[in-house]
């Protein structure tokens, strides 16, 4: 299982990586492995400002639909257009081409309250 050091993690298995004033958000390798084959990603919140922990979309696998939770407060500015035709990118490359949204965090310092790779490993292995 992959635990990149350059991202922050949530207990709900999302990750966030800040690049300038925009952050990429996705689900973790552990989450995609537990979910199985992803068949559809729905992000209806593009352009909306949400609070940390609010649902920003859903991921559909063969047997279930799972909510996606925003790691920090901010505006959802873009969804990954590649996922419309290729939702399996989330399974193949969850920290790269399989990112879900780009967002503008309301306060970048909020990322400091999230888990680092070691903290997230402890959650997964608990």
Swiss-Prot record:
Start and end residues of each Lipoyl-binding domain: 22-104
SUPFAM superfamilies per UniProt: Single hybrid motif
Named cofactor requirement(s): (R)-lipoate
Protein keywords: Lipoyl
GO biological process: glycine decarboxylation via glycine cleavage system
Domain of life assignment: Bacteria
Positions where N6-lipoyllysine occurs in the chain: 63
Cofactor note: Binds 1 lipoyl cofactor covalently.
Pfam family for this entry, one: GCV_H
InterPro entries: 2-oxoA_DH_lipoyl-BS, Biotin_lipoyl, GCV_H, GCV_H/Fam206, GCV_H_sub, Single_hybrid_motif
Family: Belongs to the GcvH family.
Function of the protein: The glycine cleavage system catalyzes the degradation of glycine. The H protein shuttles the methylamine group of glycine from the P protein to the T protein.
Protein name from the UniProt record: Glycine cleavage system H protein
Organism: Bacteroides fragilis (strain ATCC 25285 / DSM 2151 / CCUG 4856 / JCM 11019 / LMG 10263 / NCTC 9343 / Onslow / VPI 2553 / EN-2)
Name of the gene encoding the protein in the UniProt record: gcvH
């Amino acid at each position: 299982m992959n635990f990149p050091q350059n991202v922050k993690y949530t207990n709900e298995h999302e990750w966030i990586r800040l690049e300038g004033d925009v952050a990429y958000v996705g689900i973790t390798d552990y989450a995609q492995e537990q979910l199985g084959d992803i068949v559809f990603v729905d992000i209806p919140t593009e352009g909306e400002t949400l609070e940390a922990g609010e649902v920003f979309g859903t991921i559909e696998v063969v047997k279930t639909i799972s909510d996606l939770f925003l790691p920090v407060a901010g505006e959802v500015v873009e969804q990954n257009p590649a996922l419309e035709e290729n939702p399996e990118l989330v399974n193949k490359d969850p920290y790269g081409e399989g990112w879900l949204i780009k967002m503008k965090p309301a306060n970048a310092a909020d990322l400091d309250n999230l888990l680092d790779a070691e903290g997230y490993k402890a959650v997964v292995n608990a």
